Amino acid sequence: MTDLGVVFPAGPDGRRSTAALGRAVVADALRPVDPAGAGAAERETNWRAGYLPHFRRLVEAGIASREAELTIADAGLASLHRRMRVAGPDGAETALGDLVAAPAGRVLGAAEVVGTGEPERELSLPFRGQRLRGDALLRRLDTWVENGIVEPSAAEAVRTVVAHPEWLALPGTTVVVLGAGAEMGPLTALLRWGARVAGIDLPRTQLWERVLDTARRGAGTLLYPVAGEDVGADLITEVPAVADWLTGLPGHLVLGDYVYADGATNVRVSTAVDALTVRLAAARNDVALAFLATPTDVFAVPPDAVAQSV
């Protein structure tokens, strides 16, 4: 693990323990609502294998009320932001919160690719080698609901977009795709619909060749950061530079989080996105947030979904 940029806090022995951080943050999140649960998390001796019951308890404690839910989220985020650190190239460490006002290490310029394709004016979904649209898509949604494949609310959301194809291009909006090269990200679909997208990803040549090729074949506009001949930016080490670049983009901003990395690096980059969000929200009053949920988390299942499944 490279000790540069957003890093885990070091313990008394100098080690940056992911387990110690996870245990402490979950305990801090539970403490205002479920002190007993907080104590159980703190006493967990094998966090790497035993964290699941404590994450389940986070959800259970939040179900009681909206206030409890928000209190847990606020306490957990505050704990994470208070504990995580930022390591500079000189070895000095500062608080994560200092990134809100920290100067950028470099200034990022903006390059642009305008797609050559015709924008799609109708929502379609890939299915068994084809694309479902129109009545065929609506019938398939009904079948999926009847067979318990999707929840009724998910099908209704798709039907709403089908009924409003003018939404697809998101006029007047710039969608920031953090993790532009992510396979599960929306970059390809947005560009196919004719939207304006700002893509952020690591400065890797092959990655950007693929992203730029997608943009050329699409029907939208891709904005991306450059510095000289370098394309892209590393969120873990460049939150101020990326935030300054995003602050100057046109249109209403949707900040979409689709970043992913293996192991501890995923926590570091996700925390960097949090810091970026705080800084950007302080600089602009028109920022909306979007993210991709994970099926590996713990969720409270709504009553209509339970009723539909039995």
Regions found by a protein language model. Give the residues of each.
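Low-complexity, highly charged intrinsically disordered N-terminal segments
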Residues: 39-154
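Non-catalytic protein-protein interaction scaffold segments in large eukaryotic complex-forming proteins
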Residues: 1-61
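Conserved acidic E/D residue at the C-terminus of a beta-strand in Rossmann-like folds
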Residues: 199-204
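A short, basic/flexible loop-to-alpha-helix module at the beginning of a structural domain
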Residues: 152-171
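Active-site/ligand-binding-proximal alpha/beta "capping" segment
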Residues: 239-282
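Long, charge-rich C-terminal accessory regions
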Residues: 265-268, 272-310
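Extended charged low-complexity segments that act as oligomerization/scaffolding linkers
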Residues: 1-2, 208-249
